[in-house]
Amino acid sequence: MSIRSKFNKDEKKFVKFIDSTEEIIKHLNKSDSSKRSRLKLSGQQIDVLESNFKIDSHPNSATKSLLSNALSIPLKNIQIWFQNRRAKEKTARDGGRRRSGNAEIEDGEYEHGKMSYQAMCPFDFPPQERYFL
């Protein structure tokens, strides 16, 4: 047997030791049937969540708890729904584009921090002769 069990009577703990790579591989290759299934919300549940989101996009814990009980949805799923919905709204507000940290914009400034080229490089371009004397 590749798994040994040890019971320490003093500490009353049960410890398993895995002795082989085979057991580790077997554990990692377990079927996905033990994986929890995704919660599918009904149209009515989504309508209630959306209407509450319009009122308050950051509900307090009491409101989330009430929604959880009223809709028979775990509290954690309510929290995640609001988090995802806020992210969706932010993406829609930003036009769906990703922003890079220092994307150049037309007037020679950088979007992040609004630093001009002149502030980044104090000498003129193209370099003038005075720099090479």
Curated annotation (Swiss-Prot):
| CDD domains referenced in this protein's UniProt entry, alphabetically | homeodomain (cd00086)
The domain of life for this entry's organism is: Eukaryota
| Family matches, as PROSITE patterns | HOMEOBOX_1, HOMEOBOX_2
| Localisation | Nucleus
Keyword line:
DNA-binding, Homeobox, Nucleus
Annotated spans, Disordered? 86-109
Q: Which GO terms describe its cellular component?
A: nucleus
Task: Provide the GO MF annotations for this entry.
Answer: DNA-binding transcription factor activity, RNA polymerase II-specific; transcription cis-regulatory region binding
> What is the protein's name according to its record?
Homeobox protein HD-5
Q: Which organism is it from?
A: Encephalitozoon cuniculi (strain GB-M1) (Microsporidian parasite)
Primary gene name: HD-5
